[in-house]
Amino acid sequence: MRIFGIDCGSEITGYGIVECPDGTPRSGQPDLRLIAFGGIRPAKKLTLAERLAFVHRELLTQLAAHQPDLVAVEEVFYSVNAKSALKLGHVRGVALLAAATAGLPIAEYAPLTIKSTVTGYGLAQKEQVQFMVARLLHMPEPPEPADAADALAIAICHIHHAQTIQAQQSR
């Protein structure tokens, strides 16, 4: 199973690809393999429409290059700043469109679920998420940018939840 996680952002959209071969080791923890990660940074001088088009093109390029089985994204969350939330919603829409254009299924997870799955604590700070992502993926240092670490966390979250569902269905 190869999962493409996307962390939508108004300035940087992080992506991360994690693979989990079939089967789970005796420890009960999935055997995770890092494939790739990065951040999509459209130029600030571009208009909103141009920035969205840039993110869309880059996501389609990465999806084609890495051939995932599924795209996992963070669910919409509520923000005090309506303008920021609206911009984030635009980017999220572009990410969902890219996944749909590529013909891929989409899974969505709440921020608390992602953090809880990866760190064991739903209110974990960004640094804690980065640390645990690095540890789970056997990386020498936490991934940068932080948006890429969040995207990897989203992918890891899906793998854990998919394996839990498979285990329950096989009972």
Curated annotation (Swiss-Prot):
GO terms for biological process: DNA recombination; DNA repair. Its main location: cytoplasm. Keywords: Cytoplasm, DNA damage, DNA recombination, DNA repair, DNA-binding, Endonuclease, Hydrolase, Magnesium, Metal-binding, Nuclease. GO terms for molecular function: crossover junction DNA endonuclease activity; DNA binding; magnesium ion binding. The lineage of its organism: Bacteria, Pseudomonadati, Acidobacteriota, Terriglobia, Terriglobales. This is Crossover junction endodeoxyribonuclease RuvC. Mg(2+) 1 binds at residues 7, 147. The active site is at 7, 74, 147. Belongs to the RuvC family. SUPFAM superfamilies: Ribonuclease H-like (SSF53098). It holds the Pfam family RuvC. Its cofactor is Mg(2+). Binds 2 Mg(2+) ion per subunit. It comes from the Bacteria. Homodimer which binds Holliday junction (HJ) DNA. The HJ becomes 2-fold symmetrical on binding to RuvC with unstacked arms; it has a different conformation from HJ DNA in complex with RuvA. In the full resolvosome a probable DNA-RuvA(4)-RuvB(12)-RuvC(2) complex forms which resolves the HJ. InterPro entries: RNaseH-like_sf, RNaseH_sf, X-over_junc_endoDNase_Mg_BS, X-over_junc_endoDNase_RuvC. It is an enzyme of class 3 (hydrolase). The gene is ruvC. The RuvA-RuvB-RuvC complex processes Holliday junction (HJ) DNA during genetic recombination and DNA repair. Endonuclease that resolves HJ intermediates. Cleaves cruciform DNA by making single-stranded nicks across the HJ at symmetrical positions within the homologous arms, yielding a 5'-phosphate and a 3'-hydroxyl group; requires a central core of homology in the junction. The consensus cleavage sequence is 5'-(A/T)TT(C/G)-3'. Cleavage occurs on the 3'-side of the TT dinucleotide at the point of strand exchange.
